[in-house]
Design a protein with these regions (language model features):
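Residue-level signal for beta-strand positions within conserved beta-sheet cores that form or flank
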Residues: 3, 37, 87
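Soluble periplasmic/extracytoplasmic beta-strand elements of cell-envelope proteins
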Residues: 6-8, 28-30, 42, 80, ...
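Secondary-structure boundary/capping motif
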Residues: 10, 28, 54-57, 82
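Extracellular/periplasmic metallocenter environments
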Residues: 13, 59-94
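Beta-strand cores of secreted/periplasmic/IMS beta-sandwich domains, seen most often
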Residues: 17-37, 41, 65-73, 77-79
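Histidine- and aromatic-enriched segments that form or immediately flank copper-ligand environments
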Residues: 36-61
Length: 94
């Protein structure tokens, strides 16, 4: 990884269920919204969504955005689209 990870939202799904990020390094996530619905990426400590680690701006269908994710410690976290919570997965930081 060169510090940039691209994910695509299409047909109410992300193209991956697992985001692998390096521990202790800030990264850029590029969200490509190929859907007609609005989407975003939000990262939480776990699937209960108790603590938000990052909240991405919601973008409309056809748009692309770069999110600057701050450095995270090693661990397994959770991400979803706050508009469509069934669009979710794990964030593995190592």
């Amino acid at each position: 990884m060169n510090g940039v990870l691209t994910i695509t939202a299409d047909d109410l799904a992300f193209d991956t269920a697992c985001l692998a990020l390096p521990a202790g390094e800030a990264v850029t996530i590029v969200l490509v919204n190929a859907d007609s619905q609005p989407h975003n990426v939000t990262i939480y400590t776990d699937s209960s969504k108790g603590t938000e680690l990052f909240a991405g701006e919601i973008i409309e269908g056809g748009e692309t955005i770069e999110y600057e994710i701050p450095a995270l410690e090693a661990g397994t976290f959770y991400f979803d689209c706050t508009v469509h919570p069934a669009m979710n997965g794990s964030v593995v930081v190592s």
